């Protein structure tokens, strides 16, 4: 993001936080590329056949952002960090729904051939990771947030 765009994004975030809905509409095209980058980074860690695509994840996060009343972003990093956290929650909810559907509602269990059932290399258990981050947050909230933003948001220190 060029310095002029970065300044404009900061200005629009401030205006949106103070009730200017047109600022929100102007902001989205300016931040969309960065939001897609964050979404791609999340999905890269997912299994290859994941049903959500980066654009759908960004759009789902955008719908959630619309319901923030009123958003008080401190700066661009705060906004992108919040969006990254929101995407993580969307993916965790999606994973939980997928796990619930996999339980089969009474269907008989079948043993799988271990050679076929090997997980893909990049597969991450988002539910277990979310539980671990939640536990870490009770011990050290700052470390939990740091790991979340680094691992999921792709942000650096």
Which residue stretches match the model-derived regions?
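Short, charged helix-capping/linker segments at alpha-helix termini
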Residues: 3, 18-27, 37-58
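Short helix-to-turn junction characteristic of helix-turn-helix DNA-binding domains
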Residues: 16, 150-151
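Sigma70-family region 2
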Residues: 17-18, 41-48, 60-79
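Σ70-family region 2.3-2.4 aromatic/basic alpha-helix that recognizes the −10 promoter
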Residues: 32-36, 55-63, 76-96
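A short pre-motif secondary-structure segment
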Residues: 146-147
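Helix-turn-helix DNA-binding module
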Residues: 153-157
């Amino acid at each position: 993001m060029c310095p002029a765009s970065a300044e404009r994004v900061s200005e629009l975030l401030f205006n949106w936080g103070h009730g200017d809905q047109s600022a929100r509409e102007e902001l989205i095209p300016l931040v969309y590329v960065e939001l897609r980058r964050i979404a791609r980074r999340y999905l890269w860690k997912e299994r290859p056949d994941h049903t959500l695509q980066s654009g759908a994840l960004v759009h789902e996060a955008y719908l959630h952002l619309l319901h923030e009343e009123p958003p008080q972003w401190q700066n661009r990093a705060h906004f992108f960090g919040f969006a990254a956290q929101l995407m993580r929650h969307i993916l965790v909810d999606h994973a939980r729904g997928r796990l619930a559907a996999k339980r089969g509602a009474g269907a008989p269990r079948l043993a799988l051939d271990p050679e076929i059932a090997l997980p893909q290399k990049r597969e991450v258990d988002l539910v277990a990771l979310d539980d671990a981050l939640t536990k870490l947050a009770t011990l050290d909230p700052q470390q939990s947030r740091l790991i979340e933003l680094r691992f999921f948001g792709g942000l650096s220190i």
